[in-house]
Amino acid sequence: MTPALTPNPLLRRDIPAHRELMDAGGQWVVEQGADPAAVVREAQQHDVAALSVTGKDLSFLAELPELEHLRLGDAGDIGPAASLPRLRSFEAVGWDGGRIDATGWPRLQRFAVGAPPRGGGVESVYAHPTVEVLGLNRFAGTELTEVTAPRLRELRLSSPKLESLTGLEAHADTLEVLVLSGVPRLRDLSSLAAMTRLEVLGISSARGVTTLDEVAAARGLRLLDLGDQRGVESLGPLAGHPSLEYVLFQKTADMSLAALRDLPRLRAVGGYRSRDWTPDLSTFPDLVTFAEEDDVSRDYAVLRLRY
């Protein structure tokens, strides 16, 4: 008889989010088309705390109130997930119907949704008192004043409407990772100057961001990823930055790398391949040339996978 649940063999202890799942007994995957009764029976038999579901039917969740970690594909009615008071992490591609109410998850720490439906209730997470990691696609605001979660340490966001980072300064004492992608209207980055604990910043597809003056004002940055950020005029504003260790970038208008010579803690770069750079890109330590076990690569991975 084919089991309804199988353990996920791809978890890696060096990835913090995976490590949490492993410490909870591993993540169990609901096989496509599995009988809901069998899912419940096997989950109870294995004391499952972390579940990954790809199917639409979530009705069986009501019988598994001990779940702490839930990952969903493109689900149907999200309602049964409300019956999980011990939930600490929630990840979903999206769902067809129903609303979430994150106040029913008082222990929630991680939340990430790829394609939330309109009216799906994701706003109930914005001020959640225990959320530390927040990933939002299709964020509807023009600024970040709605996001007030007091323990926020990592924010990953894409939004066709975001124009300003106003409101981000409310997280100056906690936020360490900020990743912005698909933000074509974003122009105002002035709030970065207040982010004294921010160590990782990624910006991509922000056509309105052409200067790094406001980026350079975030003086605690260790990793700056402009890997898909075209149209930046110059890396010049980064010169003299006291803490940058890794810089990833596309071509700039002035094609000058002189500022990288003036980064006292620089360990590696990842740059757009071109012979037009001055000085030559090959004169800088290239991230891809370091072996996986090298400290430079390991420390980079730790920053990228902080949470």
Task: Cite the ranges covered by each PLM segment.
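Concave beta-strand-loop units of leucine-rich repeat
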Residues: 3-62, 66-79, 86-210, 214-233, ...
